[in-house]
């Protein structure tokens, strides 16, 4: 059950939506950068990229440690993709245009 809770439950590392403001109340989220650092340490990671919580565009949260990349492309009207190349971050739009938006 610990494995399930860690990876598959509503509050798991994979499905947790409490990082995003519109879900703060339903998840009773009160996260800090320190909380995010603990999760990243557990995962031995620098960032978490989430693709299941639709935003208007790619968003970065908690000092660029969390990326929300589901920008509504599934609706066929808008959308962006995240491309990471040579440690640089780009937004790709439906027209194929790449825009650098963050440097590491």
Task: Name every feature range the model reports, one short phrase each.
Residues 1-104:
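Feature recognizes metal-dependent phosphohydrolase scaffolds
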């Amino acid at each position: 059950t610990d494995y399930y809770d860690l990876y598959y439950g509503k509050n798991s590392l994979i499905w947790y939506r409490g990082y995003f403001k519109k879900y703060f109340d339903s998840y009773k989220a009160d996260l800090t950068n320190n909380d995010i650092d603990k999760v990243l340490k557990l995962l031995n990671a620098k960032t978490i990229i989430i693709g299941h919580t639709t935003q208007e565009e790619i968003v970065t949260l908690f000092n660029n440690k969390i990326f929300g990349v589901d920008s509504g492309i599934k609706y066929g009207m808008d959308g962006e993709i995240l491309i990471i190349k040579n440690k640089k971050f780009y937004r790709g739009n439906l027209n194929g245009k790449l825009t650098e938006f963050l440097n590491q």
